[in-house]
């Protein structure tokens, strides 16, 4: 019975503050939409892959050893891709449109465990630029690693052409997140409003706050 009364009380409080529950989430939603569509710059990510591949041979045991050796070299090659030498060469390949430090901030290098694949990911504000930069990294890396390591076991597996996708801002996530944030703020506001509002508004408040029985009430006349 007591829990039912509490739920009824909560329902009444929410109904009395319905405007706040509607206005604040909508306000947060509108602000998020403005920031997402008009303030934040879009980011596009393009991907390309290079393969650390074994030389051709007829000896299965030798080939298996070379595959394992190439897998171990992948981590070294990942660091080479991010090295100043590669960054400088890519910057030159792009006619110095981007500085090496800027290229470094756009670049992410990953690989799947126990594979000979290196994934080159590039993020920029333009779809075509992301693809062009990713392709340049793949091209320069495949040319420079043989010179640096004195081995010829790197090739471009896939180019970035047509791979660029928009990765930021995440419109749906931003809008939904802003709406629920506004809802939480509204509920917190209502909670503190109820906690700190000590005004006596009805007979129940008189009995609860003053501990006095209500003998009668005077109707309000207009």
From Swiss-Prot:
<keyword id="KW-0812">Transmembrane</keyword>
<keyword id="KW-0972">Capsule biogenesis/degradation</keyword>
<dbReference type="InterPro" id="IPR005701">
    <property type="entry name" value="CpsC-like"/>
</dbReference>
<dbReference type="InterPro" id="IPR050445">
    <property type="entry name" value="Bact_polysacc_biosynth/exp"/>
</dbReference>
<keyword id="KW-0270">Exopolysaccharide synthesis</keyword>
<feature type="transmembrane region" description="Helical">
    <location>
        <begin position="172"/>
        <end position="192"/>
    </location>
</feature>
<dbReference type="GO" id="GO:0005351">
    <property type="term" value="F:carbohydrate:proton symporter activity"/>
</dbReference>
<comment type="function">
    <text>Required for the biosynthesis of type 5 capsular polysaccharide (Cap5/CP5). Might act as the chain-length regulator.</text>
</comment>
<dbReference type="InterPro" id="IPR003856">
    <property type="entry name" value="LPS_length_determ_N_term"/>
</dbReference>
<keyword id="KW-1003">Cell membrane</keyword>
<dbReference type="GO" id="GO:0005886">
    <property type="term" value="C:plasma membrane"/>
</dbReference>
<dbReference type="GO" id="GO:0015774">
    <property type="term" value="P:polysaccharide transport"/>
</dbReference>
<dbReference type="GO" id="GO:0000271">
    <property type="term" value="P:polysaccharide biosynthetic process"/>
</dbReference>
<dbReference type="GO" id="GO:0004713">
    <property type="term" value="F:protein tyrosine kinase activity"/>
</dbReference>
<keyword id="KW-1133">Transmembrane helix</keyword>
<dbReference type="Pfam" id="PF02706">
    <property type="entry name" value="Wzz"/>
</dbReference>
<feature type="transmembrane region" description="Helical">
    <location>
        <begin position="20"/>
        <end position="40"/>
    </location>
</feature>
<keyword id="KW-0472">Membrane</keyword>
<comment type="similarity">
    <text>Belongs to the CpsC/CapA family.</text>
</comment>
<keyword id="KW-0843">Virulence</keyword>
<protein>
    <recommendedName>
        <fullName>Capsular polysaccharide type 5 biosynthesis protein cap5A</fullName>
    </recommendedName>
</protein>
């Amino acid at each position: 019975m007591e829990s039912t009364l509490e739920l009824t009380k909560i329902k009444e409080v929410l109904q009395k503050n319905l405007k706040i529950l509607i206005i604040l989430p909508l306000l947060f939603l509108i602000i998020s939409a403005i920031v997402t569509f008009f303030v934040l710059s879009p980011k596009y990510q393009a991907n390309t892959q290079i393969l650390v591949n074994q030389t051709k041979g007829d000896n299965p045991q030798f080939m298996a050893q070379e595959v394992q050796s190439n897998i171990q070299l992948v981590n070294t090659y990942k660091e080479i891709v991010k090295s100043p030498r590669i960054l400088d060469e890519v910057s030159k390949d792009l006619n110095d449109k981007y500085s090496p430090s800027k290229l470094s901030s756009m670049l992410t290098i990953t690989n799947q465990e126990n594979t000979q694949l290196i994934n080159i990911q590039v993020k920029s504000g333009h779809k075509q630029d992301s693809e062009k930069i990713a392709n340049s990294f793949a091209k320069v890396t495949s040319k420079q690693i043989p010179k640096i390591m004195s081995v010829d076991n790197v090739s471009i597996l896939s180019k970035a052409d047509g791979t660029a996708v928009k990765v930021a801002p995440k419109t749906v996530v931003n809008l939904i997140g802003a709406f629920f944030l506004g809802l939480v703020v509204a509920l917190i506001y209502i909670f503190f409003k109820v906690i700190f509002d000590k005004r006596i508004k009805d007979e129940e408040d008189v009995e609860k706050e003053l501990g006095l029985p209500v003998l009668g009430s005077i109707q309000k006349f207009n």
